[in-house]
Structure formats: structure tokens, C-alpha cells
């Protein structure tokens, strides 16, 4: 079987990968969506929709499906990776032998490398070499709303300005999907990881029943933690007031479509960490991200008290209420202190 030439190959047929593939195809671009399970891909092809995650959204005719990696990657120069952060490096190493010589890679994965806390750009350079153009897209996006064609805005960042412009043109749709370029490659990556952690904290607060005041305080101080860590890594602080920072943070902390927020709510209501993850039924990126962000903060000497207390709950069995009281009992300080 020959896979048709595509404007983009999307790696990862979960909810978000499928939604992005649908969006690209609706823009009139030929897209091939790859999944690792041939049976799953066959089911998607038969139904012409993703029954598990987006059952009401039909695939456009320009979206094709594939489970063979070689055929998928030969079809397109541009490759969009949408997989959980803890398998990101492994997936890239699988891709490498099949990539075209002119390949360019972008990811929508939000997080850091498991255990090491490295930015995904470093993982990608190690897995694919230093010469391939890299980019990241991030921002306040729920898969169901994106796939339904509801208005959405994101940021795209790359050290290759021409590639960023190509991605902006491929994704941008005047009716529903707005794409902003941002030159801050580090900041756009980091925002997507830290917001996952803070969203768990916001969920915990709501699960306890602390109310809107506490949730808003967590979001605001969480943004300060995100910015402090970002500046320490060389990011532009203005990025954290944009789509990949404040935008994604507010969305994930306030809407129950967020798995990280729902996970936190369950913990706040007294459920154990393992049981809550089972109840969610999909990857809770913030669980691993908490350990990774905490590692980065310690490495760079950045104070992140909210992240630290969430880490204590997730990995040290600290009671959620006790963690909240630890935050409230901290010494008074200047709001703008770094």
C-alpha cells in the first residue's frame, strides 16, 4: 500500500493528536495520522472517527491513517509528534531511521523528560542530531473543542523562523484556529510542563472545598513560579503572559476537561494517588511533570513552594490539607520578590 503525499505526518492517534490531524485536514492539507497499534488504526479507518475520544467528529477526506512508520514518514517532510512526555525520547528514536533527509519536526507534547527534567528540545537533539529543524506548539487547547471547530489560539516556537512560519500557515484557520509565533523556544516548552503541576494544585484546592479565592491565588502564584523558573533557564518572562503560559495555566486550572485538574480534585477529596490515576483512565502528565519540575527547580536554585507541596503530596504521602496549611503558614513577603 502506498501512503499519499502529505503536508504533515502526525505521530500519535490519541485525543490531541487526532484533533490536530483533523484541524490540519480541515484546512485542506493532506495529513497522515500514525498510531502504533494496527488494530486501533484499522478501527479508526473503519469508523472514520476516533470513537474512544472524539466520537462525534468525522475525519475529513484528506486525513489518511497508517500504522507503518516507514510509509508514514516517507509521505511528509514535516512531522508533528503528539505523545506523552515520558515516551517522547523513545518515540523519536523509533522515528529517526525513517525520517526523510529534509525532515522537520514539531511536537505538541507538554512536559519534560522523565527522571532528568530536561527540556524536550534537548531530548530531540540527542535523539535526532543537531541539524534537524525543531519546533513546539503549545497553548490552551482541549482536544474536544479543537476537533469541534470551536475558537482556539496557540503559540508556535522554533529556533528556525522559516519553519515557525510554515507551521503557522499550516495550522492557522481564520474561522476557528489562531496561531501566534513566539521566538522563545525555551519558555513555550516550559509553560506546558509547569501548568500541568499547578493544575493539580488547583484541583486539590477545589477538592478540599477551599473555593474560588484560593484557586485564583494558586493560579497567580503558580504563574510566578513558572516565570521564575523560566527566567533561570533563559526564557523571556513575557512568554508566560501569553498563550503557552497564562493562557494554558488558566484553562487547565479552571476547567474539568483537564485531567490534571480532575486528578487533583480526587486527591483533595481523599482518594489515593494510584486510585485517582486509574479513575482518570488516561495519562496524567502533571504527575510525572511534578517530579521533573521539582528537579529543575532544585538544580537552578529556584524557589517553587506550590510545586514543592504538590510533590510532597504525590511522592511523599503528605496529607493534602497539611500541604495547603504549609503554604498558608509561610512567612509574609513582598509579592514581587524573585
From Swiss-Prot:
Catalyzes the reduction of the glycolytic intermediate dihydroxyacetone phosphate (DHAP) to sn-glycerol 3-phosphate (G3P), the key precursor for phospholipid synthesis. It catalyses: sn-glycerol 3-phosphate + NAD(+) = dihydroxyacetone phosphate + NADH + H(+); sn-glycerol 3-phosphate + NADP(+) = dihydroxyacetone phosphate + NADPH + H(+). The gene is gpsA. InterPro entries: 6-PGluconate_DH-like_C_sf, 6PGD_dom2, G3P_DH_NAD-dep, G3P_DH_NAD-dep_C, G3P_DH_NAD-dep_N, NAD(P)-bd_dom_sf. GO terms for molecular function: glycerol-3-phosphate dehydrogenase [NAD(P)+] activity; NAD binding. One of its GO terms (biological process) is carbohydrate metabolic process. This is Glycerol-3-phosphate dehydrogenase [NAD(P)+]. Its main location: cytoplasm. It is found in: Cytoplasm. Transmembrane segments: none annotated. NADPH binds at residues 15-16, 36, 110, 143, 259, 283, 285. It holds the Pfam family NAD_Gly3P_dh_C. It comes from the Bacteria.
Amino acid at each position: 500500500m502506498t501512503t499519499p503525499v502529505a503536508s504533515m505526518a502526525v505521530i500519535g492517534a490519541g485525543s490531541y493528536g487526532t484533533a490536530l490531524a483533523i484541524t490540519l485536514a480541515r484546512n485542506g492539507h493532506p495529513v497522515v495520522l500514525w498510531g502504533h497499534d494496527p488494530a486501533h488504526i484499522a478501527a479508526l479507518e473503519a469508523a472514520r472517527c476516533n470513537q474512544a475520544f472524539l466520537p462525534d467528529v468525522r475525519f475529513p477526506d484528506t486525513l489518511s491513517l497508517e500504522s507503518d512508520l516507514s510509509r508514514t514518514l516517507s509521505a511528509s517532510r514535516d512531522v508533528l509528534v503528539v505523545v506523552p512526555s515520558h515516551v517522547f525520547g523513545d518515540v523519536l528514536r523509533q522515528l529517526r531511521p525513517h525520517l526523510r533527509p529534509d525532515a522537520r519536526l514539531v511536537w505538541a507534547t507538554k512536559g519534560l523528560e522523565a527522571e532528568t527534567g530536561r527540556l524536550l528540545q534537548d531530548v530531540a537533539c540527542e535523539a535526532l542530531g543537531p541539524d534537524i529543524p525543531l519546533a513546539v506548539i503549545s497553548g490552551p487547547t482541549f482536544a474536544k473543542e479543537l476537533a469541534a471547530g470551536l475558537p482556539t489560539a496557540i503559540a508556535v516556537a522554533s529556533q528556525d523562523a522559516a519553519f515557525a512560519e510554515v507551521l503557522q500557515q499550516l495550522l492557522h484557520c481564520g474561522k476557528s484556529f489562531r496561531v501566534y509565533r513566539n521566538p522563545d523556544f525555551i519558555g513555550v516548552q516550559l509553560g506546558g510542563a509547569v501548568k500541568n503541576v499547578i493544575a493539580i494544585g488547583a484541583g486539590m484546592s477545589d477538592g478540599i472545598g477551599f473555593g474560588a479565592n484560593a484557586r485564583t491565588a494558586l493560579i497567580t502564584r503558580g504563574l510566578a513560579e513558572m516565570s521564575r523558573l523560566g527566567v533561570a533557564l533563559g526564557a523571556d518572562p513575557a512568554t508566560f503572559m501569553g498563550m503557552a503560559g497564562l493562557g494554558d495555566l488558566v484553562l487547565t486550572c479552571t476547567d474539568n476537561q483537564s485531567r490534571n485538574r480532575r486528578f487533583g480534585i480526587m486527591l483533595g477529596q481523599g482518594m489515593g494517588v494510584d486510585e485517582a490515576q486509574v479513575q482518570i483512565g488516561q495519562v496524567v502528565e502533571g504527575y510525572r511533570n511534578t517530579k521533573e519540575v521539582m528537579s529543575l527547580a532544585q538544580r537552578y536554585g529556584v524557589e517553587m513552594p506550590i510545586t514543592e507541596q504538590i510533590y510532597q503530596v504525590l511522592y511523599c504521602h503528605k496529607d493534602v490539607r497539611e500541604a495547603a496549611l504549609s503554604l498558608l503558614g509561610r512567612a509574609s513577603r513582598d509579592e514581587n520578590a524573585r
